[in-house]
Amino acid sequence: MKIIGIDPGLRNMGWGVIAVEGPRLRHLDNGIVHSEAGDLGPRLAALYRGLCAVIVRHAPDAAAVEQTFVNKDALGTLKLGQARGIALLAPAEAGLEIGEYAPNAVKKAVVGVGHAAKEQIQHMVRFMLPGVEFAGPDAADALAVAICHAHHLQGRALRIKASA
């Protein structure tokens, strides 16, 4: 199974694709879809086209998107929410199952604690996906989201197996 993790952002939308082979995880690719400064509509369109191209190229079986948090900058939060809408729309249009995870849930799944620093997350992603080179911090976060979803799916499969 291939999973694409997405870290929504208006300037940089990180993505990472992993393969889940039983209990093993394998890095396939990661990158960042960029949007240039300017009017919001064209920026969102660029993010959408870029993310759709990644989904077509890698043909994942499932997607995972990090949930956003509200901060003091209401306008910034609103714009980030619109970018998150793109992060949900592109895989939904491709017919993918989408998991959504809070940042603390991603950190807990990857590091073991919900308030881990970015450096700790990147260290554990490198440990879980040996040889990975990050296209940037947003791509590293996206891989962490994909790993979180893989763990969720593996746990769900075990629960189904146990109840059968």
From Swiss-Prot:
Its EC number is 3.1.21.10. Binds 2 Mg(2+) ion per subunit. It catalyses: Endonucleolytic cleavage at a junction such as a reciprocal single-stranded crossover between two homologous DNA duplexes (Holliday junction). InterPro entries: RNaseH-like_sf, RNaseH_sf, X-over_junc_endoDNase_Mg_BS, X-over_junc_endoDNase_RuvC. The keyword Glycosyltransferase does not apply. Mg(2+) 1 binds at D7, D138. GO terms for biological process: DNA recombination; DNA repair. It is found in: Cytoplasm. Keywords: Cytoplasm, DNA damage, DNA recombination, DNA repair, DNA-binding, Endonuclease, Hydrolase, Magnesium, Metal-binding, Nuclease. Its cofactor is Mg(2+). The keyword RNA-binding does not apply. Its main location: cytoplasm. GO terms for molecular function: crossover junction DNA endonuclease activity; DNA binding; magnesium ion binding. One of its GO terms (cellular component) is cytoplasm. The RuvA-RuvB-RuvC complex processes Holliday junction (HJ) DNA during genetic recombination and DNA repair. Endonuclease that resolves HJ intermediates. Cleaves cruciform DNA by making single-stranded nicks across the HJ at symmetrical positions within the homologous arms, yielding a 5'-phosphate and a 3'-hydroxyl group; requires a central core of homology in the junction. The consensus cleavage sequence is 5'-(A/T)TT(C/G)-3'. Cleavage occurs on the 3'-side of the TT dinucleotide at the point of strand exchange. Belongs to the RuvC family. This is Crossover junction endodeoxyribonuclease RuvC. It comes from Paracoccus denitrificans (strain Pd 1222).
